[in-house]
Amino acid sequence: MKLHELKPAEGSRKVRNRVGRGTSSGNGKTSGRGQKGQKARSGGGVRLGFEGGQTPLFRRLPKRGFTNINAKEYAIVNLDQLNVFEDGAEVTPVVLIEAGIVKAEKSGIKILGNGELTKKLTVKAAKFSKSAEEAITAKGGSVEVI
């Protein structure tokens, strides 16, 4: 096989369909847009959600709920993720970000009890679930709310 003999795989390259190039091309005259009407015009077509004048679904349904501007969103860390640290290490939000476990601190970090902790750690975070707190102290570690 030589470079000039290389051919693309069968069916991997499709020729662009050129419309409006004479009736014998199969896509001449109306260029696949049908006859007259809004959709046949340049820039024609209806906006998203338009239902032909009928009240659209998003207006028929009632508004629901609200966004609490005081809501706090915590960065979640599970116990099994803390096993990357050495025994006796101090785990703080800064250390978690440097280790790549948490992307951003948000309103603080919350430690949850999923997984199993195998190391003795001193963990400093904004919040702890009961199960996480119990698991850390059971391994001889300590918990500090910051």
Curated annotation (Swiss-Prot):
Gene Ontology CC annotations of this record: cytosolic large ribosomal subunit
SUPFAM superfamilies per the UniProt record, alphabetical: Ribosomal proteins L15p and L18e (SSF52080)
Biased composition (Basic and acidic residues): 1-13
GO BP terms, alphabetized: translation
Residue stretches of biased makeup (Gly residues): 23-35, 42-51
The keyword Glycoprotein appears for this protein: no
Pfam families per record: Ribosomal_L27A
Entry's Gene Ontology molecular function annotations: rRNA binding; structural constituent of ribosome
Keywords of this entry: Ribonucleoprotein, Ribosomal protein, RNA-binding, rRNA-binding
Segments for region (Disordered): 1-51
NCBIfam families assigned to the protein according to its UniProt record, in alphabetical order: rplO_bact
Assembly behavior: Part of the 50S ribosomal subunit.
Main function: Binds to the 23S rRNA.
Family: Belongs to the universal ribosomal protein uL15 family.
Protein name: Large ribosomal subunit protein uL15
Species whose genome carries this gene: Streptococcus pneumoniae serotype 2 (strain D39 / NCTC 7466)
Lineage, top ranks: Bacteria, Bacillati, Bacillota, Bacilli, Lactobacillales
Gene designation per UniProt: rplO
